[in-house]
Amino acid sequence: MNKYQELVVSKLTNVINNTAEGYDDKILSLVDAAGRTFIGGAGRSLLVSRFFAMRLVHAGYQVSMVGEVVTPSIQAGDLFIVISGSGSTETLMPLVKKAKSQGAKIIVISMKAQSPMAELADLVVPVGGNDANAFDKTHGMPMGTIFELSTLWFLEATIAKLVDQKGLTEEGMRAIHANLE
């Protein structure tokens, strides 16, 4: 492993180690209880949210990406999961407020436990929350890289737990995977 790979692995391991245990169970409990799950983010956090949405679909959940032309209206009993490093992304705040006003539950996945979005959330998942310095600027990992990659890692581990708990098989998940590609 070269020094850059070691840097990435070291930083991400630190963030994951400082993310309190049990948030994966809380997320999965809210997903299970929801009628439908809506997922959103902005920028690279949007890309991470798409990974998670796809895996939930593979696991058999009814999931919509916010902002797509075919996304239905959110309603009471639904769940909105939003990924925002700052917890205050201006383009996402109106969506969080709208979802809340419609009676949906809100999960905010962020590097900040306290934020405007957190104030509206039913669950805040503070990735790296036990380390105040987890997201300090790191040369070679610019502009949110640490948050985005550690969030992807955390959510993939959450899916691994879901697959194990529900006894899902790769064959069963693959049968749900898109076949018009």
From Swiss-Prot:
BP-aspect Gene Ontology terms: carbohydrate derivative metabolic process; formaldehyde assimilation via ribulose monophosphate cycle
Question: Catalytic residues?
Answer: 148 (proton acceptor)
| SUPFAM superfamilies from the UniProt entry | SIS domain
Return the broad EC class.
isomerase
UniProt cross-references to PROSITE patterns, sorted A to Z: SIS
Q: What chemistry does it catalyse, as a reaction equation?
A: D-arabino-hex-3-ulose 6-phosphate = beta-D-fructose 6-phosphate
Domain SIS, first and last residues per copy: 27-168
In which pathway does this enzyme or protein participate? Answer: One-carbon metabolism; formaldehyde assimilation via RuMP pathway; D-fructose 6-phosphate from D-ribulose 5-phosphate and formaldehyde: step 2/2
A UniProt-annotated Pfam family: SIS
Gene3D superfamilies found in the cross-reference section:
Glucose-6-phosphate isomerase like protein, domain 1
Going by the UniProt record, its keywords in alphabetical order are: Carbohydrate metabolism, Isomerase
The residues that hold substrate are 45, 84-89
Q: What does this protein do?
A: Catalyzes the isomerization between 3-hexulose 6-phosphate and fructose 6-phosphate.
Q: How does it assemble?
A: Homodimer.
Hey, which family's this protein in?
Belongs to the SIS family. PHI subfamily.
Protein known as: 3-hexulose-6-phosphate isomerase
Native organism is: Methylomonas aminofaciens
Its lineage opens with: Bacteria, Pseudomonadati, Pseudomonadota, Gammaproteobacteria, Methylococcales
